[in-house]
Every structure is written in C-alpha cells, then in structure tokens.
C-alpha cells in the first residue's frame, strides 16, 4: 500500500530536543501501526536534524506505515538570538504557525494526502486552535510524567496549596501521589523560580486542554498506576510509553537528534560488564564550572570507568563553555571517555554500563527505567526534581546525589564518589539493579503486542481512522448554502466548517472529552 492511501496524521513539535524526540518516537509508533505521519517543526531545527540524522525527502517506511518530514520557516533569521528567549519566541512561533500550518495542510490535501488529525506537544497549544478552525480533531502528547501533569493541573486550577511567597516551604499533597516536599514540586511552580517564562509556557497547554480529544502520555500504566487512574477521570488520558521502544520497528533509522552522536560504542565494547558510569545531563542543563570540577574529581577518585557527555552550549544561550580540570584526561587514561553527544538508547542498553548519572529529565528517566539501568539522581529544575523523587523513593532504582537548584549547594567530590560507589558496588547497588530490571520487564510488556500501551496506541489509531472516515463522509455530503446572517445563526458553527470536530468531540454531560476505543 502506498503512503498516499493511508490515514494521515500531522505532528507539530516545539523546536526543543526534549520535545522533538518523544513526538518523533510517537510518530514512528503511529507509522508502525499503519498510518502516514508527517512531522513538522521550524526549519532552524530541521536543518540540524537533516545534518545529524540523514533525514531524506521521501517518506520512510516504518512497520505498516510511513513517516515524512516538512519544516517551516519561523519568520526569523537563522542566527536570531531571540529564539533563546521563550517570552519572545513563543508568540512569534504562534503567529507564524497559525498562518503556515493551515497552508501546509491544504497543500497536503491538494497532493492527495488529506490530514485527519493534528498532534502537538507542550509549549504550542495553539495547534489545537488550528485544528478546530479546520474542522479537524487534535490530540496532545505530554512529554513529562503523569505525576507532573497532575501537579500542573492542580496548580492551574488552584485545587491544593502550593509553595507561595507567604509559605515557601510547605509540603504538597496531591491525590494518589506521595507527599512532595517543597523542593520536590516541579520547580517552575516555585514563586521564586528564575524560569517564570517556562511556567507560562506550560500553563498555556492547560488553557486549551478541553480541545484535544486525547492526551497521549509517554509513560505506562504499570509505572504510575494510581495517578493515571485518577487523572483519567478528569482528562482523556492514554498512556503510550515508553515511546523509544518500538517492537514493530526496533531499528528504524529515523532520529530526531540535533547533533550527530560520537562513536562510543566500540569503547564500551572494550570494557567489562557493569563497569562503566554513564554521565549525561541532557540537552538543556548546564552546570557551573566549580560543580563540573567536583564531578570530574569524584569520577577519578571512584576508580570506575566512565563515559561523560559534555554537550557544548548554544552560542546564544549565555552559558559558558565548560572545561575539564587540567590533566584530567591524562589521569583518566583509558578508564574515561568524554564525548559531545551520545547515542543514549544504545549506551543505556550496553552491558558494560553499570549506572547512569542523570539530570532526571523525563526522556532520560523513561529510557533508564525501560533499559533496567540504575540511576544516580542529579536533578536541577523543572520536572527533574519530581522525577528524581519518583526514581529514588517510589520506583527505587537509584541514589540521590542532590536535590536541585533550590538546594543552592555545591556537591563536593567526596559525595560524588560515595554516590557512584553506592550505585555500583555492594547491597544497595544490587537492590536498585534488581528493581530496575523489574521496571524494564514491565516496560517491555507494556509496549509488546497486547500490552497496556500497545492497546492504547491501537485504540488511538482506530479512533483517528474512524474520525477520518467521518470527515471524508462529511466533505462528500452537500452543504447548505448560507445566504444571510439569519440562516448562519440557524445552522451555527456546523454550517461554517467542512469538518466534524464539534460532532465528533465525544463530550459527555460533564463536558469531559472521551476517547472512543
């Protein structure tokens, strides 16, 4: 079957590495189930993706479907520094996107690829407005944990007390979740957060939460069972993770990296089993030089092999380029390897890797859990502090090295060394490894045929197909010709759209939007 005969979903991503990766993984999962998927994000990122990931012009076959890429200009010059300021960039992206995305969808329809559903990730909730204006259904992919989704939801609606300027250090008790200390709440919700623009960006999604017919989540039922069950009574949630595991297309050569990964697998091949500490703080966390130095000496003093990812900051980010202590690489010798970027999925699956020193972003957390990899938690801000709480205290797969930026504390080399050894040697290491392997098995079962996430993906695909048939049927029916305002008032919105978003929303009497399986 050619790609043009398949039901077509259109994925629109915010141009951040931590947003692109899970949405592209969702796209590959949907393609493997027999859909045509178009992935789009601004050209400034598309250029990097093409360079790093060998993305071609033709649709790539994945499982029973295809995935293709279209990128769009965001209206700013290539080197525009304002992209680093979300308060300036998000309005620009919305302004351009609301004009460009409808044109892209119209062009696809003219080329016999009519779009049946739009899917966005956080920071760009206006995509659901575009879908509504076109009479198309929309869905949203949430790229953090369900626990964090619940925290933001309760904050937005003022349902429980959160830290405030008058009560900075209060604990937060959310339904079906463990008690969160003030520094375990997503830090964007702190009254003193240095990132208020990120709080505003996240809250924007909750303003539009009534428009998507489904909220897809990169988690799985068995991992966050209680909070998923609770929030599913409020929002139309479908858990579809871990998205990076795709049984129907395990080796699909379609990636969303912005940098080409360095070759480190051959070096890992040369090391004994469970002997290497993997250190990576993701794509957006940058530590200060003095903390970098302490981590470096902690690694050396531990005597363990290590693979350390040191991603250089974007030139307009304002972060300094960090350096290693003088003579560090010479002292480490063949026991250490430093790279700018790594193929993290392969690294975490490698038998020589013993533990993962991580910032605890949700993508990295899911990859660690699903790979059976113990962690050393080094969160900094945002959802990372909440993820660290769950990794250490709930999922019990690691040890905590720090509590985040709110702690405002330099973690010394002796603490680094102690945590590394605790996670790799002795009874604690054996305990967290055993727990990690249990979560790996649960993750694999969730995405296997008939597993909880696989069933949810299939239900979503079936619903998109059902809505696609209804949309095409609606387009083929004769429409009433609206002659004047009085007639328009009589027919209402249904007369002004050639889609069926209102008819197919599936709302119940309480206004909750339900996904029909």
UniProtKB/Swiss-Prot annotation:
pH dependence: Optimum pH is 4.5.
Principal subcellular localization: cytoplasm
Binding-site positions, UDP-alpha-D-glucose: 344, 359, 362-364, 367, 383-384
GO biological process terms on file: 3,4-dihydroxybenzoate metabolic process; cinnamic acid ester metabolic process; ferulate metabolic process
Temperature dependence: Activity remains fairly constant between 20-55 degrees Celsius. Active even at 0 degrees Celsius.
Reactions catalysed according to its record: 3,4,5-trihydroxybenzoate + UDP-alpha-D-glucose = 1-O-galloyl-beta-D-glucose + UDP; 3,4-dihydroxybenzoate + UDP-alpha-D-glucose = 1-O-(3,4-dihydroxy-benzoyl)-beta-D-glucose + UDP; 4-hydroxybenzoate + UDP-alpha-D-glucose = 4-(beta-D-glucosyloxy)benzoate + UDP + H(+); (E)-cinnamate + UDP-alpha-D-glucose = 1-O-(trans-cinnamoyl)-beta-D-glucose + UDP
Lineage top rank: taxon: Eukaryota
Compartments, record wording: Cytoplasm
Keywords from the named record: Cytoplasm, Glycosyltransferase, Transferase
Tissue expression per record: Highly expressed in leaf. Also expressed in peel, stem, root and aril.
Active site, per annotation: 19
PROSITE patterns named in the record: UDPGT
EC number: 2.4.1.136, 2.4.1.120, 2.4.1.170, 2.4.1.177
Annotated Gene Ontology cellular component terms: cytoplasm
Keyword Membrane: no
Binding residue positions for an anthocyanidin: 19, 382
Annotated GO MF terms: 4-hydroxybenzoate 4-O-beta-D-glucosyltransferase activity; cinnamate beta-D-glucosyltransferase activity; flavone 7-O-beta-glucosyltransferase activity; gallate 1-beta-glucosyltransferase activity; isoflavone 7-O-glucosyltransferase activity; quercetin 3-O-glucosyltransferase activity; quercetin 7-O-glucosyltransferase activity; sinapate 1-glucosyltransferase activity
Disruption phenotype: No difference in the levels of punicalagin in pomegranate hairy roots in a single RNAi knockdown of this gene. However, double RNAi knockdown of this gene together with UGT84A23 leads to significantly reduced levels of punicalagin and bis-hexahydroxydipheynyl glucose isomers, and to increased levels of galloyl glucosides (ether-linked gallic acid and glucose).
Class in the EC hierarchy, top level: transferase
Stated family: Belongs to the UDP-glycosyltransferase family.
Function: Glucosyltransferase that catalyzes the formation of 1-O-beta-D-glucose esters with hydroxybenzoic acids and cinnamic acid including its derivatives as preferred glucosyl acceptors. Has significant activity with gallic acid (3,4,5-trihydroxybenzoic acid), 3,4-dihydroxybenzoic acid, 4-hydroxybenzoic acid, cinnamic acid, sinapic acid, coumaric acid, caffeic acid and ferulic acid in vitro.
Protein name, per record: Gallate 1-beta-glucosyltransferase 84A24
Originating organism: Punica granatum (Pomegranate)
């Amino acid at each position: 079957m050619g790609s043009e005969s398949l039901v077509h979903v259109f994925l629109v991503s915010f141009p951040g590495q931590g947003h692109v990766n899970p949405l592209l993984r969702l796209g590959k999962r949907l393609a493997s189930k027999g859909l045509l998927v178009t992935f789009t994000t601004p050209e400034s990122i598309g250029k990097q993706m093409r360079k790093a990931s060998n993305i071609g012009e033709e649709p790539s076959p994945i499982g029973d479907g295809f995935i293709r890429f279209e990128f769009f200009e965001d209206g700013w010059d290539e080197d525009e520094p304002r992209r680093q300021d979300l308060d300036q960039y998000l309005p620009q992206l919305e302004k351009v996107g609301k004009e460009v995305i409808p044109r892209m969808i119209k062009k696809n329809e003219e080329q016999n690829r009519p779009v049946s559903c739009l899917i966005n990730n956080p920071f760009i909730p206006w995509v659901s407005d575009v879908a509504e204006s076109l009479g198309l259904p929309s869905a949203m992919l949430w790229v953090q944990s369900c626990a964090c989704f619940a925290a933001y939801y309760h904050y937005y609606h003022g349902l429980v007390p959160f830290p405030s300027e008058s009560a900075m250090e209060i604990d937060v008790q959310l339904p079906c979740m463990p008690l969160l200390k003030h520094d375990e709440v997503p830090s964007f919700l702190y009254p003193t957060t240095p990132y208020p623009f990120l709080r505003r960006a996240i809250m924007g999604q909750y303003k539009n939460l009534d428009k998507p017919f489904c909220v897809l989540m990169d988690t799985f039922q068995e991992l966050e069972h209680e909070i998923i069950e609770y929030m599913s009574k409020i929002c139309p949630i479908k858990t579809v993770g871990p998205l990076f595991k795709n049984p129907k297309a395990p080796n699909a050569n379609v990636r969303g990296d912005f940098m080409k990964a360095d070759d480190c697998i051959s070096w890992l091949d040369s090391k004994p089993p469970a002997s290497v500490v993997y250190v990576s703080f993701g794509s957006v966390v940058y530590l200060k030089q003095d903390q970098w130095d302490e981590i470096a000496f902690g690694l050396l003093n531990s005597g363990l092999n290590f693979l350390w990812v040191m991603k250089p900051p974007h030139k307009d980010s304002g972060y300094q380029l960090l350096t290693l202590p003088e003579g560090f690489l010479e002292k480490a010798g063949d026991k250490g390897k430093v790279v700018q970027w790594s193929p993290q999925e392969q690294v975490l699956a490698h038998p020589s890797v013993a533990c993962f020193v991580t910032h605890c972003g949700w993508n990295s957390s899911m990859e660690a859990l699903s790979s059976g990899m113990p962690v050393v938690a080094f969160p900094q801000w945002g959802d990372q502090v909440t993820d660290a709480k769950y990794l250490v205290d709930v999922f019990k797969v690691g040890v905590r090295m720090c509590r985040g930026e709110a702690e405002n504390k330099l973690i010394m080399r002796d603490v680094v060394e102690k945590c590394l050894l605790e996670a790799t040697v002795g009874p604690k290491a054996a305990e967290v490894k055993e727990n990690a392997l249990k979560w790996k098995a649960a993750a694999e079962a969730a995405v296997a045929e008939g597993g909880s996430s696989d069933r949810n993906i299939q239900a979503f695909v079936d619903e998109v197909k059902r809505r696609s048939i209804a949309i095409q049927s609606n387009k083929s029916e004769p429409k009433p010709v609206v002659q004047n305002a009085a007639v328009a008032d009589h027919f209402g919105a249904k007369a002004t759209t050639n889609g069926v978003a209102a008819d197919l929303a599936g709302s119940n009497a309480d206004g909750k939007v339900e996904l029909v399986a």
